[in-house]
Amino acid sequence: MLLATFKLCAGSSYRHVRSMKGLRQQAVLAIGQELNRRALGGPAPAAWIYQVRRRGSLLGSQLEDSLYSDQELAYIQQGEEAMQRALGILKDQEGWKKESRQVNGDEVLSKVIPDVGKVFRLEVVVDQPMERLYEELVERMEAMGEWNPSVKEIKVLQKIGKDTIITHELAAEAAGNLVGPRDFVSVRCTKRRGSMCVLAGTATLYEEMPQQKGVIRAEHGPTCMVLRPLAGSPSRTKLTWLLSIDLKGWLPKTIINQVLSQTQVDFANHLRKRLESCPALEARC
């Protein structure tokens, strides 16, 4: 009965099976062979179970990929590669130079990275749980202009799956208007690794958001924020922000360094005020 049912199903879906490629055909063939073998009363080998599970996992991955266009898959890959690059920079503890240290312990470090340029690293502790920061920085991202004076506006242009988005950010003038208005188009990727949340991004091209008149299109390099519960105090959060920006235009390096370093210090202060004054939503990282 089982064998007959399989043959009937296989016959009715023959045209569909013909359109399958690679692993899909192999999976169908393996299932057919196993059903035939079971009809003869043989035992189920562990090796076959392993192969079906493996093929099923690969097939699931292929089916998930098929939900996205080639361009969307390219954005996903670009975001994940930016995350790996940024985490690799943070992992290397050698060569960091102290830019500033605040009374509350907030610290900005810098380092020159080959093929990237000068990057800045903010290290702070926030007296809020990690979920609250995740909520504000990810789920309420488009509201950042309400509390961060460095940002005029952030818009999510496209969501791709559950981890990847394309954003447009309009930055405010800085350094007494010496640094004019800039905007950024970025691909951002959000992942959780155990108790750690990583929010990463980098500059990208997006046809629906061409360069704006009167605004310089700047670029984020591999950038990320890492959130994790403070060791021994899970209601507090250790935030590490790696900032890499090419502001474009002609600007003295001394001004660029001062602006980026101060931007990180100001961000930490404004974030704390926002978290204290704005009620939390039900968010989980």
Curated annotation (Swiss-Prot):
<comment type="pathway">
    <text>Steroid metabolism; cholesterol metabolism.</text>
</comment>
<keyword id="KW-0446">Lipid-binding</keyword>
<dbReference type="GO" id="GO:0032367">
    <property type="term" value="P:intracellular cholesterol transport"/>
</dbReference>
<feature type="modified residue" description="Phosphoserine; by PKA">
    <location>
        <position position="195"/>
    </location>
</feature>
<keyword id="KW-0755">Steroidogenesis</keyword>
<protein>
    <recommendedName>
        <fullName>Steroidogenic acute regulatory protein, mitochondrial</fullName>
    </recommendedName>
</protein>
<dbReference type="InterPro" id="IPR023393">
    <property type="entry name" value="START-like_dom_sf"/>
</dbReference>
<comment type="subunit">
    <text>May interact with TSPO.</text>
</comment>
<comment type="function">
    <text>Plays a key role in steroid hormone synthesis by enhancing the metabolism of cholesterol into pregnenolone. Mediates the transfer of cholesterol from the outer mitochondrial membrane to the inner mitochondrial membrane where it is cleaved to pregnenolone.</text>
</comment>
<dbReference type="GO" id="GO:0008203">
    <property type="term" value="P:cholesterol metabolic process"/>
</dbReference>
<dbReference type="GO" id="GO:0120020">
    <property type="term" value="F:cholesterol transfer activity"/>
</dbReference>
<keyword id="KW-0809">Transit peptide</keyword>
<keyword id="KW-0813">Transport</keyword>
<feature type="modified residue" description="Phosphoserine; by PKA">
    <location>
        <position position="57"/>
    </location>
</feature>
<dbReference type="InterPro" id="IPR002913">
    <property type="entry name" value="START_lipid-bd_dom"/>
</dbReference>
<feature type="domain" description="START">
    <location>
        <begin position="67"/>
        <end position="280"/>
    </location>
</feature>
<keyword id="KW-0445">Lipid transport</keyword>
<dbReference type="GO" id="GO:0050810">
    <property type="term" value="P:regulation of steroid biosynthetic process"/>
</dbReference>
<feature type="transit peptide" description="Mitochondrion">
    <location>
        <begin position="1"/>
        <end position="63"/>
    </location>
</feature>
<dbReference type="GO" id="GO:0005739">
    <property type="term" value="C:mitochondrion"/>
</dbReference>
<keyword id="KW-0597">Phosphoprotein</keyword>
<dbReference type="GO" id="GO:0015485">
    <property type="term" value="F:cholesterol binding"/>
</dbReference>
<dbReference type="InterPro" id="IPR029866">
    <property type="entry name" value="StAR"/>
</dbReference>
<keyword id="KW-0496">Mitochondrion</keyword>
<dbReference type="Pfam" id="PF01852">
    <property type="entry name" value="START"/>
</dbReference>
<dbReference type="GO" id="GO:0006694">
    <property type="term" value="P:steroid biosynthetic process"/>
</dbReference>
<dbReference type="InterPro" id="IPR000799">
    <property type="entry name" value="StAR-like"/>
</dbReference>
